[in-house]
Amino acid sequence: MHLNTTLLVSLALGAASVLASPAPPAITAPPTAEEIAKRATTCTFSGSNGASSASKSKTSCSTIVLSNVAVPSGTTLDLTKLNDGTHVIFSGETTFGYKEWSGPLISVSGSDLTITGASGHSINGDGSRWWDGEGGNGGKTKPKFFAAHSLTNSVISGLKIVNSPVQVFSVAGSDYLTLKDITIDNSDGDDNGGHNTDAFDIGTSTYVTISGATVYNQDDCVAVNSGENIYFSGGYCSGGHGLSIGSVGGRSDNTVKNVTFVDSTIINSDNGVRIKTNIDTTGSVSDVTYKDITLTSIAKYGIVVQQNYGDTSSTPTTGVPITDFVLDNVHGSVVSSGTNILISCGSGSCSDWTWTDVSVSGGKTSSKCTNVPSGASC
């Protein structure tokens, strides 16, 4: 038998095509009807057993309702490793037992999650039980509040958090995370020893958006310690330390890049706009913009840049350069005992700054500014 040339070529090409094709993906068994039904379930957890029950059953629920959950002392409300697409709803008042420990009180991780609060809810840390004026620097060991770690393509919105013992949100190892319309009210701590009650601490994360936050606290409203593509808008920050980059340096990740603060108000706070890099460390801060920022009754510094954070009496060091720093329409008031602007840069380590329509008044003019780059004034 003789095959014609066309047929031989066709067979050869077909064989080659089969050999060159990648192996098909492994086929896994589809979920059973029972598994699908479980994942479609709305699960409600409440009372003193609610936290442990939620932790045990969390992967069996597509919607988790936490209704008046009383988390036992020394226990984390563990919502880590949730199924993709899980919706968590805080309802009623969530409370926490007292114990000296480091926390966190709540921990969440997963992908495509939605974390919301029902109308009238509150997450009450009752921080006065720990407050002693020391914060994380000593005294009682205080639990951090909310670990938003290893979150991807997720949204946390509409939560009302009251009286955290110390830091509120720790955002770490997260990408494409949105925090929207969050209220943090630690105002009781103003006269009762609240300290280091940072609202949003961000590290080693990318594409984090915080919008519409209302914060009353006693430390940074936002502190970006490392990360890229961070956006904060429409914020109201009262009583704390302002909108901060850093402190940067001395960590495993010391790069801050492409951070924008826009359309926000800072009132009755120690600082307004703040960049702080730790003395004798390395890293970089670049592409940071503050636009349309209003300052009111700032107590210490309206705008402050320090490359000697940790030892401000020493000469600023150059290991963490600050480049492409933009201020656009930053204006407002400092109290008479405060300082309008302080810039403490190392030699040549602050460059490519662009300040436009910057007006901060009411306080003193600093005589301690060093190595102020062109494009800025002190």
UniProtKB/Swiss-Prot annotation:
Superkingdom of origin organism: Eukaryota
Active site per UniProt: D219 (proton donor), H241
Catalysed reactions, as listed in the record: (1,4-alpha-D-galacturonosyl)n+m + H2O = (1,4-alpha-D-galacturonosyl)n + (1,4-alpha-D-galacturonosyl)m
PbH1 repeats mapped onto the chain: 174-204, 205-226, 227-247, 256-277, 285-307
Propeptide: 21-39
Enzyme class: hydrolase
Glycosylated residues (UniProt): T44, S46, S48, S52, S53, S55, S57, S62, T63, S73, N258
Compartments (UniProt record): Secreted
Name of the protein in question: Endopolygalacturonase I
Organism per entry: Aspergillus aculeatus
